[in-house]
Amino acid sequence: MEQAMLKTLALLVLGMHYWCATGFPVYDYDPSSLQEALSASVAKVNSQSLSPYLFRATRSSLKRVNVLDEDTLVMNLEFSVQETTCLRDSGDPSTCAFQRGYSVPTAACRSTVQMSKGQVKDVWAHCRWASSSESNSSEEMMFGDMARSHRRRNDYLLGFLSDESRSEQFRDRSLEIMRRGQPPAHRRFLNLHRRARVNSGFE
């Protein structure tokens, strides 16, 4: 019994060594990469928001990482944003103070970020109001390609979509990015689907 276990362990170690020797993609999910993805997501929100003030992330979590090859990956994030005291032309919202009050605009957001060699290549995001006092449950802010600008509405909303339509668009966008960067068929087994939850280290 012990010999069988030792043999299994030895085969496992040899298999891991073989994968590493053949270039199995290993990506270092350091805090700077996650911060870069979050910053790009918040920047997308601010770039297409109709608010006169900048939004800033209050909390975030990494929901999924799709590794396409040794240099390219797609991150799916969830994060919350709140309006700050800085005007739109203030630049980086990371140093801005949050506005105070019961009716301060706050939204829950999701984003898909494609990164290559540590650099952000593409970002898609959408948000919904976190407070029912701000809008009803069907109202959302959509942040994506400028081709969607016809969906803009009053206040800070950029679209009205049902939950089903929102889910389909988010899923289609993530799949589109993965297909665009899909490696050749003989290397598809290298794709990883990892789930990780990150504490509010971006706060």
Swiss-Prot record:
The keyword Disulfide bond applies. The keyword Ligase does not apply. One of its GO terms (biological process) is protein-containing complex assembly. It is found in: Secreted. Keywords: Disulfide bond, Phosphoprotein, Secreted, Signal. GO terms for cellular component: extracellular region; protein-containing complex. This is Secreted phosphoprotein 24. It comes from the Eukaryota. The modification Phosphoserine is found at residues 90, 137-138, 162, 165, 174. Could coordinate an aspect of bone turnover. It holds the Pfam family Spp-24. Residues 1-23 form the signal peptide. Disulfide bonds join 86-96, 109-127. InterPro entries: Cystatin_sf, Spp-24. Phosphorylation sites are present in the extracellular medium. Belongs to the SPP2 family. Its main location: secreted.
